[in-house]
Amino acid sequence: MATERHYSPLDRLLLQADSAMRTLLPLSAHPQRPSPAVVQPDHKMSDVDTRHVAGLMRINHTGEVCAQALYQGQALTAKLPKVRKAMEHAAEEEIDHLVWCEQRIHQLGSHTSVLNPLFYGLSFGIGAVAGVISDRVSLGFVAATEDQVCKHLSEHLEQLPSEDGKSRAILEQMLNDEEHHAESALEAGGFRFPAPVKFGMSILAKVMTKSTYRI
């Protein structure tokens, strides 16, 4: 029977540093699943639509950077091993989204946000603090965050040009995955955040979306 490996605090810090580099350095992360966009035809879009879609995908990419940092921060401070493993597994799934968005951004001739390191650091800190408070709060924060992500994805799907099947396929799969993450976090005992807290989170999310649309 295989035994579970136990990491020292130093081991975990080194793993966090490795995760941060794979998240922030271009083309350094590798997905477990191929992008849903690969089976979609590549239709020509106007320059205006191309720039708009690139901006939307840049927002989504930064959202995945934040998700990576949030999960890694929570995994570092989670009290129960099963919660830590759940956070680490969720972070692995989010890598797919991260890479899919990055690939699509480059296909559109654009770039990822220069603000990603800042948002990674902020999200990592928030995740670590949530994990210190309690695992229930940590899981609840995941559910509330994923709810915000789902709202953004739904809004972006409505804004996509009809001919952009590639971006649509990516966002639809991301939406499905994020809904599952939110449900799993609550089923695992996550605390349901009250409306005022969710409102505050939505304000922070708007700061991120407004700032990363162009830069």
Curated annotation (Swiss-Prot):
Record note on cofactor: Binds 2 iron ions per subunit.
Catalysis performed (reactions): a 5-methoxy-2-methyl-3-(all-trans-polyprenyl)benzene-1,4-diol + AH2 + O2 = a 3-demethylubiquinol + A + H2O
Location relative to the cell: Cell membrane
EC number(s) stated in the UniProt entry for this protein: 1.14.99.60
Protein residues bound to Fe cation 2: E94, E146, E178, H181
GO biological process: ubiquinone biosynthetic process
Binding positions for Fe cation 1 per the UniProt entry: E64, E94, H97, E178
CDD domains per record: DMQH
Function: Catalyzes the hydroxylation of 2-nonaprenyl-3-methyl-6-methoxy-1,4-benzoquinol during ubiquinone biosynthesis.
Protein name, per record: 3-demethoxyubiquinol 3-hydroxylase
Source species of the chain: Pseudomonas savastanoi pv. phaseolicola (strain 1448A / Race 6) (Pseudomonas syringae pv. phaseolicola (strain 1448A / Race 6))
Lineage: Bacteria, Pseudomonadati, Pseudomonadota, Gammaproteobacteria, Pseudomonadales
